[in-house]
């Protein structure tokens, strides 16, 4: 994931920077020690060569040794401080890496289920309009003709507002498609054979994935038409401007096939 990778890269750069600082400090300490020792050897050589006086030579050697010991003590203190800083930075980086790793593992293991998960009973309620006795369903009450989900149901439910129609004339269907370009609705059109003709999905509907119903006919004419409920990504207005027939038009990004097929007694025609 991007967050742990960036943290590792930052930790690595910090460690490299501290390593360079330690290397530079060691080099400076070595140069200063060698430059301080040169006068000592020179003064010792001068002491051997000059025999005029022994007391000044002894004092010079003691002063040089004292300065060298003071410089070594300062170097030791600097090294201790740098070592403490190095351990602090390293420990903090390791702790941060472990914390991020734990957070990533926890979030990946505790993902909540998808927002749109439909049970089989919900699919039946969504797709089945009425029974023979004229009972009500989310699509409304009475006949299947011209049925649609009421506005109140849509406001309190993740289901799309759907409307199914069948057009007898191509001119009327073309006029409807032209209207959809300017004012798209959540509409699904079926042909009389039960196959999906054209599906329009409102791009302004919510922020979740739209619900789309597709119909499929089997080779056996006695079998009922099977409707599949699938959850797709939202369509943009530009993607909806030129819908074609069902053989070539594909909805952009299938998010989830919600459930097994649901059989209806009759197709949803207008």
Curated annotation (Swiss-Prot):
Family: Belongs to the HHV-5 UL132 family.
Residues with glycosylation annotation: 31, 61, 245
Pfam families recorded: gpUL132
Disordered: annotated segments: 33-70, 129-179
Protein name per its UniProtKB record: Envelope glycoprotein UL132
Keywords assigned by UniProt, alphabetized: Glycoprotein, Membrane, Signal, Transmembrane, Transmembrane helix, Viral envelope protein, Virion
Membrane-topology annotation of the record: Single-pass membrane protein
Gene behind the chain: UL132
Biased composition, class Low complexity, residue ranges: 33-67, 133-147
């Amino acid at each position: 994931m991007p967050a742990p990778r960036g943290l590792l890269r930052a930790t690595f750069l910090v460690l490299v920077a501290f390593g360079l600082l330690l290397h530079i400090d060691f080099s400076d300490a070595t140069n200063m020690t060698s430059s301080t020792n040169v006068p000592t050897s020179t003064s010792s050589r001068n002491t051997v060569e000059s025999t005029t006086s022994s007391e000044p030579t002894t004092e010079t050697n003691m002063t040089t040794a004292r300065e060298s010991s003071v410089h070594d003590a300062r170097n030791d203190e600097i090294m201790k401080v740098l070592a403490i800083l190095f351990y602090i930075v390293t420990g903090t980086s390791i702790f941060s890496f472990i914390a991020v790793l734990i957070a990533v593992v926890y979030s990946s293991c505790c993902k909540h289920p998808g927002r749109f998960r439909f049970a089989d009973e919900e699919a039946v309620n969504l797709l089945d309009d009425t029974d023979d006795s004229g009972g009500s369903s989310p699509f409304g009450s009475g006949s299947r003709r011209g049925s649609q989900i009421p506005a109140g149901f849509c406001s309190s439910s993740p289901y799309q507002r759907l409307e199914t129609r069948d057009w007898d004339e191509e001119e009327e269907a073309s006029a409807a498609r032209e209207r959809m370009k300017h004012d798209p609705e959540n509409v699904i059109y079926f042909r009389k054979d039960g196959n999906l003709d054209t599906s329009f999905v409102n791009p302004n509907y919510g922020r979740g994935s739209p619900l789309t119903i597709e119909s499929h006919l089997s080779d056996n004419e006695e079998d009922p038409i099977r409707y599949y409920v699938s959850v797709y990504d939202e369509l943009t207005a530009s993607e909806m401007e030129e819908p074609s027939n069902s053989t070539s038009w594909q909805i952009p990004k299938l998010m989830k096939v919600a459930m097994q097929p649901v059989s209806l007694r009759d197709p949803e025609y207008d």
